[in-house]
């Protein structure tokens, strides 16, 4: 039954979220594209051809389970779609906004190659995760069992934050050190708001903190604290400085 909702690319055209009018955009740095409405996200997800060999997944650096969460979205099972996207990606709503889908998943979509227009994978990924935040489905990490091992992470950019998320899910005690006053690295300081609004990054930082990740900000390693001191405090150290 679920597959009958799919393969709709022959009757439904590719559509992107509505772009905000230029007259509105020139007065702010808010994101350029509006959110999909639910019915439009369902429609666009249903265009997936459910390939036996999903090139979208194999060309994704994270190997996200794209066909399955598209199928769940098409079926209206958005919470399950979010949980599946989160299983392989710490920041699905951020990747949905800034990942170069045209060169990766969408650029290798089979129906794009056949002239039907790619599935709008990034826009759907953004939609299901933003919906998860709105519905309260995104919760702080609660490990099944706390462990005594401690890991220090130098750098609060996307690599450091993703490592912290994975380690906390395993119950490891994590402290992140960063010289800036806010976590996020390039996500916070390098990407303009019209591509990635900063509250999207901050809510992920807050989620990690609520899940037990400790942040030592305004802490310049080598100036405010030595590497030797960090090494002495932890069982292992990850250097994630970009």
Enumerate the predicted regions with their spans.
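N-terminal Rossmann-like FAD-binding beta1-loop-alpha1 element of flavoenzymes
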Residues: 150-175
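Ferredoxin-type iron-sulfur electron-transfer modules and their immediate structural context
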Residues: 1-150, 198, 237-242
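Residue-level detector of alpha-helix initiation sites
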Residues: 90, 157-158, 182
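N-terminal Rossmann-like dinucleotide/flavin-binding domain of flavoprotein oxidoreductases
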Residues: 82-89, 124, 187-236
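Glycine-rich FAD pyrophosphate-binding loop
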Residues: 172-188
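Beta-sheet entry/capping signal
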Residues: 173-175, 235-238
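General beta-strand structural signal in soluble alpha/beta enzymes
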Residues: 178, 215-217, 239-241
């Amino acid at each position: 039954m679920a597959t009958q909702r799919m393969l709709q690319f022959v009757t439904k055209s590719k559509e992107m979220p509505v772009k905000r009018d230029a007259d509105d955009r020139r007065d702010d740095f808010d994101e350029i594209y509006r959110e999909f409405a639910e019915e439009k996200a369902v429609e666009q997800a249903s265009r997936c051809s459910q390939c036996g060999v999903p090139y979208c997944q194999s060309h994704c650096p994270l190997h996200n389970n794209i066909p399955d969460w598209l199928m769940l979205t098409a079926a209206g099972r958005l919470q399950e779609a979010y949980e599946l996207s989160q299983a392989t990606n710490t920041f699905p709503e951020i990747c949905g906004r800034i990942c170069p889908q045209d060169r990766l998943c969408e650029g290798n979509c089979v129906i794009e190659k056949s002239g039907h227009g790619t599935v709008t994978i990034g826009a759907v990924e953004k939609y299901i995760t933003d919906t998860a935040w709105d519905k309260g489905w995104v919760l702080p990490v609660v490990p099944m069992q706390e462990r005594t091992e401690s890991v220090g992470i130098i750098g609060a950019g996307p690599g450091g934050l993703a490592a912290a998320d994975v380690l906390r899910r395993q119950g490891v005690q994590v402290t992140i050190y960063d010289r800036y006053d806010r976590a996020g690295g390039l996500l916070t300081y390098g990407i303009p708001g019209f591509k990635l609004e900063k509250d999207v990054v901050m809510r992920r930082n807050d989620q990690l903190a609520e899940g037990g990740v400790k942040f030592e900000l305004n802490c310049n390693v080598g100036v405010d604290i030595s590497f030797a001191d960090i090494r002495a405090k932890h069982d292992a150290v990850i250097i994630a400085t970009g």
